[in-house]
């Protein structure tokens, strides 16, 4: 259900943008999916296509790009990637992080110094990286 809510927000944003730009058609929507949130791209794509049906976005190409999750320790400055520690997380913890990415601090620590005080440098959320539109001739 979380993916449907994300898809709805993406579609509403794309349609609002297209309307403000007086677009006649949305040709493509590029969406970046942060690795940390572990969003199911297939479900988001299906939901987006359903939500775009009957709008100027129907038939738009949907492009996904996964953004690797990178962390930086505030204590020692060490940087590491989620894939380096992901195998230590069980399915329940991954589900918790999926819904509330901020809880990652409770389950992951810096592999260098053990601190839980780190920042997510990239790969946390979901955002629209681009919307390609078509305008009527003369606009």
Swiss-Prot record:
It holds the Pfam family HypA. GO terms for biological process: protein maturation; protein modification process. One of its GO terms (molecular function) is zinc ion binding. Ni(2+) binds at residue 2. It comes from the Archaea. Zn(2+) binds at residues 73, 76, 110, 113. Keywords: Metal-binding, Nickel, Zinc. NCBIfam families: PRK03824.1 (NF003008). Involved in the maturation of [NiFe] hydrogenases. Required for nickel insertion into the metal center of the hydrogenase. Belongs to the HypA/HybF family. HAMAP family: HypA_HybF (MF_00213). This is Hydrogenase maturation factor HypA. It comes from Pyrococcus abyssi (strain GE5 / Orsay). The gene is hypA.
């Amino acid at each position: 259900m979380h993916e449907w809510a994300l898809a709805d927000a993406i579609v509403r944003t794309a349609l609002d943008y297209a309307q403000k730009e007086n677009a006649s058609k949305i040709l493509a929507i590029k969406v970046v999916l942060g690795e940390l949130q572990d969003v199911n791209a297939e479900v988001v794509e299906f939901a987006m296509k359903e939500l775009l049906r009957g709008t100027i976005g129907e038939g738009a190409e949907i492009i996904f790009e996964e953004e690797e999750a990178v962390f930086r320790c505030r204590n020692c400055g060490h940087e590491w990637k989620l894939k380096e520690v992901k195998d230590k997380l069980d399915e329940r913890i991954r589900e918790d992080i999926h819904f509330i990415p901020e809880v990652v601090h409770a389950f992951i620590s810096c592999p260098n110094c053990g601190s839980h005080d780190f920042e997510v440098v990239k790969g946390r959320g979901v955002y629209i990286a681009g919307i390609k539109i078509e305008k009527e001739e003369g606009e």
